[in-house]
């Protein structure tokens, strides 16, 4: 029998593979399960392998294959989203607000326009969520590409090293790794072609943290 965290991770991997065909990164899995470190993800992956639910594909980075799912898959999906129930769309997906585009490069004007994006229920944990379309290439080394859709859990707090939606001077939004340096905030890209950005903490507002990603082909 799987633990709750093992169930949650298995379904997160399964739904990511079903939607995009790409395994989530360890960072994405850590954020989705709200764990403090990637070591916890490594332990969960190992446990799922040992129980015959997943296997690693040799000679391929970030390559996981789901071999089987637990019989109580439906019940677990209900538990994952029990604290937040947005309006449902067809085909077992949930619609969340799509707030325009977010810069993965230089900051751009924040959160213009709104429509909706349909996502699998297992992408969403507790709390309110929204989606943004990525513009730019500054986060490519984190597996986030121009045109991707990111799933964001709405929060005004950020932990060290998380990927966040940061609002600069209440006008420009950007997607970056979050770091504190005393009274300053450093926003790091995941592309060596871009330099880190540093601001006084009073100029930065956290709009949410990354919990998932969708890619359309």
UniProtKB/Swiss-Prot annotation:
Alphabetical keyword list: Autocatalytic cleavage, DNA damage, DNA repair, DNA replication, DNA-binding, Hydrolase, Repressor, SOS response, Transcription, Transcription regulation
DNA-binding region(s), residue ranges: 26-46
GO biological process: DNA repair; DNA replication; negative regulation of DNA-templated transcription; proteolysis; SOS response
EC class of the enzyme, as a word: hydrolase
Site keyed Cleavage: positions: 104-105
NCBIfam families: lexA (TIGR00498)
PANTHER family linked to this entry: LEXA REPRESSOR (PTHR33516), LEXA REPRESSOR-RELATED (PTHR33516:SF2)
Job description of the protein: Represses a number of genes involved in the response to DNA damage (SOS response), including recA and lexA. In the presence of single-stranded DNA, RecA interacts with LexA causing an autocatalytic cleavage which disrupts the DNA-binding part of LexA, leading to derepression of the SOS regulon and eventually DNA repair.
Quaternary structure (record): Homodimer.
Name of the protein: LexA repressor
Organism name: Zymomonas mobilis subsp. mobilis (strain ATCC 31821 / ZM4 / CP4)
Gene: lexA
